[in-house]
């Protein structure tokens, strides 16, 4: 990729517009998780230290275009940024037609999704954004899969368009995991439905050495192998698809190891009685809610031998203590592995937090949908636009 990096630019005296992802959860005016705000600080500080006139914008929630609403205002974010940076961070409400900002100053521009034309990647709005700055910096990987005015259109028209440190760290980590991985490459893909991860599975099966499936996805593969899954969540209409994915893997020498034992219950309840069963001993009224200890040990061995691990999704109902052991075993294996590891997806990050392994994972992707689309082999609009500008 030939993307211009913000870290390679001299921003002194330049007007710099930075698109961040500051879409944080807010309840009753209070920010309940500020991870995205703290993640943005090094980018903002770097621009300020170089003497740039810094404008920052982000989306928050899903406001109606053309209508200001307090519930979707970035006001709490501006206040928290000012506390973290130790300087006043004014919030500018009407900013599309011009912004007053001096070198060494930082202003936060109100929720860009309130601007008419943002969602449709309107060209006129994109040009107005571009006219605000000398340099546009795209640093919001989490929205890189959306072709909108602040994530795509402005890149086409800004005098200079660059990738910010957060975005580039994400792209560098994903490239290391998928484009030139240390072998063997092992992926863990889990979730409730094969249908939501079909493209991901189809793309990864052409790259990986081992593909571990978990959750409802694993149940569909177990059923496709001819085993009874009882009352478990699975997709009977995708059994042939699962068989094809297994055949495609085998054809290129890759492996999709199936569970040899599972943890079952009679009801989907936190206090349900957990019972370990061989995969061929599942009863008609059983629910499969986790992988069994023997399977977890086998998978942990594969992780230990891997050169690269990509993790998307917990392998059991880890929110229920009795059905969290499989996910915990894999999390601990990843934490102690020498492999380059990348973890992403909301439930995966919750598992990383629950088992306190964040420091042992090489890279944690906060990209959500963008992370998934990249794993699916799709071109992200923001990345493609930055690449075109850097060529």
Curated annotation (Swiss-Prot):
Q: In which pathway does it act?
A: Carbohydrate degradation; glycolysis; pyruvate from D-glyceraldehyde 3-phosphate: step 2/5
GO molecular-function term, one example from the UniProt record:
ADP binding
Q: Name one GO cellular component term.
A: cytosol
Q: What PROSITE patterns does this protein map onto?
A: PGLYCERATE_KINASE (PS00111)
Residue ranges annotated as coiled coil are none
**UniProt xrefs under SUPFAM superfamilies:** Phosphoglycerate kinase
Q: What is its EC number?
A: 2.7.2.3
* Protein location: Cytoplasm
- Its chief place of residence is cytoplasm
Q: What GO biological process, any one, is recorded here? A: gluconeogenesis
Q: Which residues bind ATP?
A: 197, 319, 345-348
Annotated residues that bind substrate are located at 21-23, 36, 59-62, 113, 146
Key words, A-Z: ATP-binding, Cytoplasm, Glycolysis, Kinase, Nucleotide-binding, Transferase
Q: Which InterPro entries match?
A: Phosphoglycerate_kinase, Phosphoglycerate_kinase_CS, Phosphoglycerate_kinase_N, Phosphoglycerate_kinase_sf
Q: What class of enzyme is it?
A: transferase
Task: Name the reaction it catalyses.
Answer: (2R)-3-phosphoglycerate + ATP = (2R)-3-phospho-glyceroyl phosphate + ADP
Q: How does it assemble?
A: Monomer.
Please give the PANTHER family that the UniProt record associates with this protein.
PHOSPHOGLYCERATE KINASE, PHOSPHOGLYCERATE KINASE 1, CHLOROPLASTIC-RELATED
Give the record's family classification.
Belongs to the phosphoglycerate kinase family.
The protein here is known as: Phosphoglycerate kinase
Q: Which organism is it from?
A: Stenotrophomonas maltophilia (strain K279a)
């Amino acid at each position: 990729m030939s993307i211009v990096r913000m870290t390679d630019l001299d921003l002194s005296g330049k007007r710099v517009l930075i698109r961040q992802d500051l879409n944080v959860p807010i309840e009753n005016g209070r920010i309940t998780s500020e991870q995205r705000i703290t993640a943005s600080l090094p980018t903002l500080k770097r621009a300020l230290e170089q003497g740039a006139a810094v404008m920052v914008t982000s989306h928050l929630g899903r406001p109606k275009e053309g209508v200001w609403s307090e519930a979707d205002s970035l006001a709490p974010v501006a206040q928290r940024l000012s506390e973290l940076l130790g300087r006043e961070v004014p919030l500018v409400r009407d900013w599309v037609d011009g912004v007053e900002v001096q070198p060494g100053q930082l202003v936060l521009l109100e929720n860009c999704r309130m601007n008419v034309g943002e969602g449709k990647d309107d060209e006129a709005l994109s040009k107005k954004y571009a006219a605000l700055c000398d340099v546009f910096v795209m640093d919001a990987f989490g929205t890189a899969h959306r072709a909108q005015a602040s994530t795509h259109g402005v890149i086409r028209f800004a005098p200079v368009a660059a990738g910010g440190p957060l975005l580039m760290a994400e792209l560098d980590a994903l490239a290391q995991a998928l484009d030139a991985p240390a072998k063997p490459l092992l992926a863990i893909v889990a979730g409730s439905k094969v249908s939501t991860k079909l493209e991901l599975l189809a793309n990864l099966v052409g790259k990986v050495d081992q593909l571990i499936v978990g959750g409802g996805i694993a149940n569909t593969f177990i059923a496709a192998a001819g085993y009874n899954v009882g009352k478990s969540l699975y997709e009977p209409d995708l059994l042939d698809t699962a068989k094809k994915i297994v055949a495609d893997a085998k054809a290129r020498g890759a492996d999709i190891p199936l569970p040899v034992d599972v943890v079952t219950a009679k009801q989907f309840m936190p206090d349900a009685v957990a019972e370990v069963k061989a995969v061929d001993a599942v009863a008609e009224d059983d629910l499969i809610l986790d992988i069994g200890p023997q399977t977890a040990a086998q998978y942990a061995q594969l992780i230990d031998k891997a050169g690269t691990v990509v993790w998307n999704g917990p392998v059991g109902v880890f929110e229920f203590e009795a059905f969290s052991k499989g996910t915990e075993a894999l999390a601990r294996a990843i934490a102690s592995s020498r492999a380059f590891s990348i973890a992403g997806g909301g439930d995966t990050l919750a598992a990383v937090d629950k088992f306190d392994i964040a420091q042992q994972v090489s890279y944690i992707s906060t990209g959500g949908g963008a992370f998934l689309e990249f794993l699916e082999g799709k071109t992200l609009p923001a990345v493609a636009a930055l690449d075109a500008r850097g060529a």
